From Swiss-Prot:
Biased composition (Basic residues): 62-89
Annotated disulfide bonds: none
Pfam families found in the cross-reference section: SH2 (PF00017)
GO cellular component, one term: apical cortex
Compositional bias (Low complexity): 21-30, 181-194
Residue ranges constituting the SH2 domain according to the UniProt record: 286-379
Protein name: EGFR adapter protein
Species this protein is from: Drosophila melanogaster
Length: 421
């Protein structure tokens, strides 16, 4: 049987295809055909072959050239006796890199691979003939210095420090990766901890940093402002109320929440009262600013109707509360809110306004207005002692006059109540 060795050579100057076929006698029991496909970087041939048929490519079209065995071309080169042929590119084709795609060993392989197209290689690429790898895989697997630097940048600072080594690049910014998360990358820029920080082997001593800047760098400006507001409130209250007990609580756990001040039950807050009003109410037995609501209920429940106390409101800051003992049909103790107005004070729901708390209480002790009962002013403790001394001395003391004045006011109140004025 005739074996055909067909080789395709492309001439870059004439663009012609030369077919070289060699015939030799072989054993009649085996029919094999060796076909070597050579593709230039600019043209992609289709590997379609049949018995005695080779498909070649032109710049635009595919042509099928049939060469009968009766008229073989004279061979220019004897085929190599080995089973595998290793073609060498022509010297004129050095400018066009040639890639050997596949070596067909038998006629059966040619028929199986007919109709399949090989991928077009990119111009200028020189892949290995036996190991074809993509540029991305080669770039990832290549141990170049550029890839190492790129991987080190993507890692966290601490992992980056451990990867590079303790003593590697010491004295540069990469040898101090933890400075960026604490106090900044520059020591003399004025940001972060300032110029007095100490660096030991790339790590910053955070104990000597300023608290405000350290908190701002760690938790943000909102937390720093919250702590600053808390410190200012503490200093202000320590100056104004040094003996009062204070308790600080935070409503939420977030850094944006502002600190809240909740006073104790015994705290005395007279910020909304002037000094004259404080001196005026200092000797009043019915004014108990710091008494809580529960204690006022317990104290007034054992008194007769008309007994009252004025305390500071626990629900409305800056306002006062009037706790009044009322007759039995109603609840034992009723609470009225005393509001602060531009003119002074008034009871919520009432129309009349008064210049001071004492004037308001004095008026409602005589004229109950909308209260269920008039306010009963408590007798001062000094009145009883002076009354006993005056009675013992024959009524010549000043205590008797004060007692008589207090009694006349009560009589006047009763008379006005009877007249329903």
């Amino acid at each position: 049987m005739i074996m055909q060795d067909i080789r395709l050579r492309l001439e870059p100057q004439h663009s012609k295809a030369t077919f070289i076929s060699s015939s030799s006698a072989s054993s009649s029991s085996s029919q094999t055909a060796e076909t070597t496909l050579i593709e230039t970087a600019e043209k992609s041939p289709a590997s379609e072959a049949a018995a005695g048929t080779v498909t070649t490519t032109s710049p635009q079209h595919f042509f099928h050239h049939h060469h009968p065995p009766a008229h073989p071309h004279p061979p220019r080169q004897q085929p190599h006796p080995h089973s595998h042929s290793h073609p060498h590119p022509h010297p004129q084709l050095q400018r066009r890199p040639v890639e050997q795609l596949h070596l067909l060993h038998s006629h059966h392989d040619v028929q199986e691979l007919s109709g399949q197209e090989h991928p077009h290689p990119q111009p200028g690429s020189h892949p290995h003939p036996h190991h074809l790898r993509s540029p991305s895989s080669e770039e990832d697997n290549s141990p170049t210095e550029m890839n190492n630097c790129r991987r080190l940048v993507d890692k966290p600072p601490l992992v980056k420090r451990l990867t590079m080594g303790i003593g590697l690049l010491r004295g540069t910014e990469d040898s101090r990766p933890l400075m960026h998360s604490t106090c900044g990358s520059s020591l003399t820029s004025g940001s972060g901890c300032g110029s007095t920080q100490t660096i030991s082997d790339g790590y910053v001593n955070e104990a000597i940093c300023e608290p405000d800047k350290y908190v701002a760098s760690k938790f943000g400006d909102s937390c720093r402002q919250s702590l600053s507001a808390l410190e200012s409130a503490t200093q202000r209250l320590q100056v104004e109320l040094p003996a009062a007990s204070k308790k600080y609580l935070r409503e939420t756990c977030s850094a944006n929440s502002s600190p809240k001040l909740f006073p104790g039950h015994s705290a005395l807050r007279l910020d909304n009262l002037s000094l004259a009003e404080q001196q005026e109410l200092k000797g009043a037995a019915w004014f108990q600013a710091g008494i809580p609501r529960e204690i006022s209920l317990e104290a007034l429940s054992r008194q007769s109707p008309g007994a009252f106390l004025v305390r500071q409101s626990s629900t409305k800051p800056g306002c006062f509360a009037l706790s009044l003992r009322v007759p039995p049909p109603s609840p034992r103790v009723a609470h009225y809110l005393i509001l602060r107005t531009q003119r002074g004070y008034k009871i919520k729901g009432f129309t009349k306004e008064f210049s001071s708390l004492k004037a308001l209480i004095t008026h409602h002790s005589v004229m109950p207005e909308l209260l269920p009962v008039p306010l009963t002013l408590p007798r001062p403790p000094s009145t009883r002692s002076q009354r006993s001394q005056g009675a013992y001395a024959g009524g010549t003391g000043n205590g008797g006059a004060d007692f008589e004045m207090y009694g006349s006011l009560n009589d006047f109140r009763k008379m006005m109540a009877d007249l329903n004025v």
